[in-house]
Amino acid sequence: MSGLPPAVSGERFEFDSAAGRLSCYVAGNGPPLMLVHSVNAAASAAEVRPLHEHYCGSRMVFSIDLPGYGHSNRSDRPYTPRLMTDALHALVTKIRARCGAAPIDALAASLSCEFLARAAAEAPASFRSLSLVSPTGFRGGQSRRRAPGSTLAMPWLLRTLRGPPALQWGGAVFRGLTRPGVIRYFLGRTWGGKNIDETLWAYDIHTTRQPGAEFAPLHFLSGGLFSADIHTVYESLAMPVWMSHGVRGDFTDYRGKSLVDGRPNWRFSIFQTGALPYFEVESQFREAFDRFLLEADGAGITGSPSAA
């Protein structure tokens, strides 16, 4: 993406994978930390910027652009949980080749928590800990225990969004959803208020103007990136897991947390923020995150989960 500036600091490198050509930023020195942005119409590594910029002072931080986003391959192809999970597996391989074979700490936001959880369930030896920020799949009344690998895709909706082959109005639909004012509106729903991060808003506008920017979001909007078996995946995780979320905006229904809140390897924090608390209460979030990592490092996560 020749016209797209870097989302965060550090070196940006690209590599081929089963998920296509991927882009990732790396900065800092020390134990590796993998950061995974959320999935929406305007996603990119810019969504993890506060964490990337802070932790590169003490860790080697890897912040990926998922397939269909940022500088990664944005071709017209099916975008699925399998594709996203394969991208994370590929990045883990790169991280371990560079940093050694020790298991890594990884953090993801929103829907990408499902991809990270699946990657960890499939390759548990690769991950020391998982941090899930405002994870999807915990809405009250849901039961997502369908066949392994199944999704919530609605093919009819994808066809409607894309339009017939002769017209292909999907690009126009996407452009309507990513006008500057619309992006601001949806960020406001994420934050639960008007005091959004203006730097992120500006980058979102830029990244949605890149060629192929509509393809992954159309699959997202039609349900194709949501896993129908994610409850089974979450329950299978045996490494330390920290789940955090806010209380404002569109992402506040976590009644389904009862699925895992009795498990000794899970920890929980609630922040008086929207869905991306590390933008709003950086110090408070980092303090809770650091405490979790320290506990995970000392193998102290063995008793009943705590709340903060």
Label the predicted regions.
Residues 121, 130-169:
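Flexible "cap/lid" loop of the alpha/beta hydrolase fold
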Residues 23-71:
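Conserved HGGG/HGGXW glycine-rich cap/lid loop of the alpha/beta-hydrolase fold
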Residues 168-235:
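Conserved alpha/beta-hydrolase catalytic His-Asp/Glu region
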Residues 2-21:
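N-terminal cap/lid segment of alpha/beta-hydrolase-fold proteins
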Residues 113-124, 130:
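Short glycine-enriched nucleophile-adjacent loop
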Residues 236-273:
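Conserved loop-alpha-helix segment in the C-terminal half of the alpha/beta-hydrolase fold
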Residues 263-308:
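Catalytic active-site module of serine/aspartate enzymes centered on a nucleophile-bearing elbow/loop
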Residues 63-107, 111, 123:
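Active-site loop/oxyanion-hole signature of alpha/beta-hydrolase fold enzymes
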